[in-house]
């Protein structure tokens, strides 16, 4: 049986969380392109659901010791900043 080293798991967890954050950004970007107003209930529900799911993933990885709390906050904060910027761009149209 192959033993998995902890740093490998840490890197994999970080990569998976970042990939999920990128998927959320792309999903919201596509929704924004197809909406006439960002206050659409469907848009808000999708955003809230996706962000909640990612926050649970991050918390789980932190609790397992795969990532630090600071890295988890950075993943969430970075995505929130990107989405806020996307929202600003949409409102400038």
UniProtKB/Swiss-Prot annotation:
Belongs to the UPF0358 family. SUPFAM superfamilies: EF2458-like (SSF140404). It holds the Pfam family DUF1507. InterPro entries: UPF0358, UPF0358_sf. This is UPF0358 protein BBR47_22520.
């Amino acid at each position: 049986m192959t033993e998995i080293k902890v740093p490998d798991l840490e890197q994999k967890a970080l990569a998976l969380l970042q990939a999920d954050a990128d998927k959320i950004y792309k999903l919201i970007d596509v929704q924004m392109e197809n909406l006439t107003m960002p206050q659409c209930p469907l848009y808000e529900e999708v955003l809230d659901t996706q962000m909640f799911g990612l926050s649970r993933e991050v918390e789980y990885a932190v609790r397992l010791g795969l990532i630090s709390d600071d890295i988890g906050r950075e993943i969430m904060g970075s995505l929130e900043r990107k989405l806020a910027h996307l929202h600003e761009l949409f409102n400038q149209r």
